[in-house]
């Protein structure tokens, strides 16, 4: 994956105030995706071998344009590399522009399935990631919860059978699929460090592609 030295964004007072307002209203860090988690009985993602791939990576407009262009490229490359490490070679890949929609919402699946059929794929794999910044709460399970500004990826995974378009696996955005830039010592409630964007992308892609390596 290309290195580019992008680090966590600095919060301005306006950003922090906005993030706090969003958190208070239940908007920041929420998982309101309309997609419902599901799996066709007996289906395992490890059975996928030569799918078509659809990737959407959404980055906020506040990010510098150069990084806004580069981050999706790096994320897409990480997805392809991750699938290849699992022995999965995509027969076709298309990336669609980012949007303000939640992961797995607002995608043209009909067009993607049509293209997948033309490519001779048996499955369509959709990876839909969105980069955000907001106030999140960490260390909940330790009993020493701490809230603070966080850069994070929310991501959804969907696998469809190309022949009839039926969903085989749907994993909408969820807390256990969220990659965050904050590393905290939950015992002392102290910030250890903030991850680079490269690390954050690697973490996010590893989480969303986990079903392809599960045995």
Model-flagged regions — what are they?
Residues 27-98, 208-215:
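A structural "domain/chain start" motif
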Residues 106-167:
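Surface-exposed short loop/turn segments
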Residues 1-26:
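Sec-dependent bacterial lipoprotein signal peptides
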Residues 59-61, 130-135, 177:
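Solvent-exposed loop/turn segments at secondary-structure junctions
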């Amino acid at each position: 994956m290309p290195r580019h030295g992008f680090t966590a964004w600095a919060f301005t007072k306006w950003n922090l105030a906005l993030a706090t307002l969003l958190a208070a209203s239940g908007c920041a860090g929420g998982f309101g995706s309309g997609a419902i988690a599901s799996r066709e009985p007996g289906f395992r993602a490890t059975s996928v071998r030569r799918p078509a791939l659809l990737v959407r990576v959404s980055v906020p407009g506040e990010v510098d344009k150069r990084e806004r262009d580069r981050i999706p490229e790096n994320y897409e490359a990480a997805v392809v590399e991750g699938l290849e490490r699992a022995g999965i070679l995509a027969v076709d890949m298309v990336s669609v522009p980012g949007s303000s929609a939640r992961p797995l919402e607002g995608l043209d699946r009909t067009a993607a399935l049509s293209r997948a059929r033309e490519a001779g794929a048996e499955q369509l794999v959709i990876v839909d990631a969105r980069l955000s910044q907001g106030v999140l709460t960490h260390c909940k399970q330790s009993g020493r919860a701490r809230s603070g500004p966080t850069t994070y990826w929310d991501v959804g995974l969907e696998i469809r059978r190309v022949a009839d378009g039926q969903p085989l696996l749907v994993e909408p955005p969820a807390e256990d699929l969220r990659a965050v830039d904050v590393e905290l010592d939950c015992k002392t409630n102290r910030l250890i460090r903030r991850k680079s964007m490269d690390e954050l992308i690697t973490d996010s892609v590893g989480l969303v592609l986990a079903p392809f390596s599960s045995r």
